[in-house]
């Protein structure tokens, strides 16, 4: 449920139009379980690292609609109360979603008819996030190896032996294998 560390630093869990699209192919339970995981994941990240180390800013997330998006815009606005009710249960925030059309001129947009805000979203500095996470790992003796090609992992007595494609091997008490969306 993550994203690349090279993303734009969005701390988000779903716009109304995204959730409406997802509801066409998934159950309500599946969608709101996923939103809850995203919300709790962001809260946990903020707890572990701290807002200052993340450079977290609760600016909100915006969804803009042009005149060509009228049907989608109408559907999103019709479902505001429904989504606010569901997100209140998850986030504890009363009005996660709201109309932000009065900010269109302030933001300097043209050809935008309507705009929604998601008050639960924000931004993070992913570089600072990774720096803080790596520091936490190093402080407890965790070594992270990026960009290595593992050819084999096997048990060797009370250790795991990890073989790399360059002929190098290491022994470790524990191994965590993680991949991102590009692996």
Which residue stretches match the model-derived regions?
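Glycine-rich nucleotide phosphate-binding loop and flanking beta-alpha elements
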Residues: 70, 182-183
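Flavin (FAD/FMN) cofactor-binding and adjacent substrate-gating region
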Residues: 17-23, 52-59, 66-132, 157
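Conserved beta-strand scaffold positions in the cores of enzyme catalytic domains, especially
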Residues: 10, 61, 95-97, 144
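Helical element adjacent to the flavin cofactor pocket in flavoenzyme catalytic cores
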Residues: 109-174, 178
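Glycine-rich active-site loop/strand segments that organize a redox cofactor
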Residues: 2, 6-37
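Class I S-adenosyl-L-methionine
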Residues: 12, 46, 50, 81-88, ...
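Glycine-rich, N-terminal phosphate-binding loop of Rossmann-like dinucleotide-binding domains
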Residues: 15, 179-180
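A non-catalytic, amphipathic alpha-helix used as a structural packing/dimerization or gating element
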Residues: 29, 33-47, 82, 132
């Amino acid at each position: 449920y993550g994203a690349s560390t090279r993303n734009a630093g969005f701390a988000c869990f779903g716009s109304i139009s995204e959730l409406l699209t997802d509801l066409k192919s998934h159950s309500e339970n599946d969608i709101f379980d996923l939103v809850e995981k995203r919300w709790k994941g962001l809260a946990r990240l903020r707890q572990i690292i701290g807002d200052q180390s993340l450079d977290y800013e609760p600016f909100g997330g915006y969804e803009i609609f042009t005149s060509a998006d009228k049907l989608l815009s109408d559907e999103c606005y019709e479902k505001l109360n429904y989504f606010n009710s569901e997100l209140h249960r998850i986030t504890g925030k009363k009005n996660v979603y709201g109309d932000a059309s009065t900010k269109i001129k302030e933001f300097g947009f043209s050809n935008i008819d309507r705009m929604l805000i998601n008050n639960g979203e924000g931004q993070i500095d992913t570089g600072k996030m990774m720096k803080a996470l790596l520091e936490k790992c190093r402080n407890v003796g965790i070594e992270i190896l990026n960009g290595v090609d593992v050819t084999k992992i096997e048990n060797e007595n009370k250790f795991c032996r990890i073989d790399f494609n360059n002929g190098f091997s290491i022994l470790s008490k524990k191994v965590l294998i993680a991949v991102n969306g590009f692996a």
